[in-house]
A protein has these predicted regions:
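Extended oligomerization regions of viral-like shell subunits
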Residues: 112-212
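Acidic, proline/serine/threonine- and glycine-rich low-complexity intrinsically disordered segments
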Residues: 249-251
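Conserved small/polar residues in nucleotide/adenosyl-binding loops
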Residues: 253-262
Length: 264
């Protein structure tokens, strides 16, 4: 049994009075059962709490993937999955290859990538396919390249999807998941071990996030108004961490500048 290391996380947000009112008002009006002529304190509190939870959840989600404790700023409270897998890769614990900077300019290369990861995957990972929990976790450029490849197929279905869009992408029955973290990847320094373009094939259950908001001294959740700054502020202090349970059932490919070990 693997123990997930937890680190202290402090998330604090500030909103101007006008912005805060607009966000809370939008959340309230989106609820059909609310009577705007007779708002209660409970309804307002629920809207504020929802706003807070959404912001905290996004902060945890981004750190869960791009977190790097060696970074001077940004998502540095705990190491995310990408750094952990990159470390495994550097130690030759997972199947890995690198691709060139312009590889995704050719949409068909995304298919070659998926195929290579599957063919070279650990047999344990292949055996798990029938359970329906495998996924290709990809950066947005890889997702876009695969979508463009599907658009180029000369079928009626491809044309319809080109017009209407696709809700989900799959490759041989395995979901292709766009992690939607491009804005966070763009902020990483050039020396960051976290790749800006990548694809990971693994079982969803192999990636574990742990959050503890109650059992550690100093943990707190607060919402208050700061009259000096005229801001509504929200703060959460808690313990969180994530890890890859088993590096064996992981196949990994990524872009690394100036490395051309494999030409797709």
């Amino acid at each position: 049994q693997k123990t997930i290391p937890l680190n202290r996380v402090k998330a604090e947000l500030g909103y101007s009075a006008a912005d805060y009112f607009s966000l809370v008002y939008e959340l309230i009006t989106n609820r059909p059962e609310v009577n705007m002529e007779d708002l209660t304190g409970t309804e307002l509190e629920e809207a504020e709490t929802t706003l807070f939870k959404q912001a905290i959840a996004e902060s945890i989600r981004s750190t869960m993937w791009v977190g790097d404790t060696s970074a001077e700023s940004g998502a540095n409270t705990f190491d995310g999955f990408l750094k952990t897998i990159a470390t495994y890769s550097n130690n030759n614990k997972v199947y890995t290859y690198n691709y060139e900077t312009d590889a995704m300019n050719t949409p068909a290369n995304s298919v070659a990538m998926f195929d290579d990861l599957w063919k070279n995957a650990d047999e344990r990972l292949k055996d798990l396919k029938a359970e329906g929990q495998l996924a290709f976790f990809v950066s947005s450029d890889v997702y876009s390249a695969y979508e463009k490849h599907l658009d180029s197929m000369s079928t009626d279905g491809a044309y319809t999807d080109y017009i209407n869009g696709r809700q989900n992408l799959l490759y041989h029955g395995i979901p292709v998941v766009d992690l939607r973290i491009s804005s966070y990847l763009a902020k990483l320094s050039s020396s960051s071990p976290v790749p800006k373009s990548f694809c990971i094939l693994t079982d969803r259950r192999n990636l574990v996030l742990a959050v503890n908001t109650a059992d550690f001294p100093g943990n707190e959740i607060r919402m208050w108004y700061n009259p000096d700054e005229m801001e509504n502020r929200q703060r959460a202090v808690f313990m969180a961490g994530c890890d890859v349970l088993d590096e064996g059932p992981v196949s990994y490919t990524h872009l690394r500048a100036h490395e051309t070990e494999l030409h797709l």
